[in-house]
Amino acid sequence: MASERSPRDLYQLSIGYILILITVWTPNPYQRFFFWLSFAVVVGFCLQGRLRGEPLGLGFQGFLRSTWVIAIALMLSLLAIYFAIREHTVHYFFGHTIFGPRAWGYLVWATLQQFILQTFILTRLLRLFPERSTAILLAAFMFSLAHFPNMLLVATTLVWGIGSCALFLRYRNLYTVGIIHFVLGVTLAVSIPSDIHHNMRVGLGYYFYRPHHSVTLYRGINPKPISHR
């Protein structure tokens, strides 16, 4: 059965991933077209798999058992923000309050990224490679490569890609890894100066980043000015 699926899994994985890379490296307004094309293709392939009995990871099974991991992520987030406050680097999420629509929109985007990584990429790699560890490493590498040339995100998504794939295989729940992705991503965005992570941009957008003055979340701390030279 696995050998019959391998050719289909390979071409679906290749088509979907190539479209994702094209999207990342295409300028606007054409990028929007490729984004929705990639989205439709990936979701279409996953729905085909669902018709064959493959799980999408969108149920609530395993969520409650995995909430301890979310709790750890929240504690690490608070610790990172605490040190960022001490170093006067903490700032708003892309110039918006953390509870603004852009921040919460990132929760949807984070969960969608995990859907692509786990439901689309990892599921197919697990059928293409007999060793689970090989599939996890390849999935994490593909996830990381899509964040080039932002080397901070390349490194962090490689580590998170491995961790999130392991968590997904244990709990089979996308909401858990989506929430953790959101927590860690926002923490990274507000704790590290935008000049370093370029507003978390990847691909062609990384090179179009323009510095702007970040607004501190804690005005009473007298933050150090962030240089944009």
Where are each of the predicted segments found?
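Interfacial transmembrane-helix boundary/kink motif in multi-pass membrane proteins
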Residues: M1-I15, R50-L79, F94-R102, L128
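Aromatic-anchored segments of alpha-helical transmembrane domains
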Residues: G16-W25, M75-A84, A140-P149, V183-P193
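Structural signal for the C-terminal ends of transmembrane alpha-helices
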Residues: W25-T26, G44-E54, Y82-R86, L167-R170
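Function-critical hydrophobic alpha-helical transmembrane segments in multi-pass membrane proteins
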Residues: Y92-L145
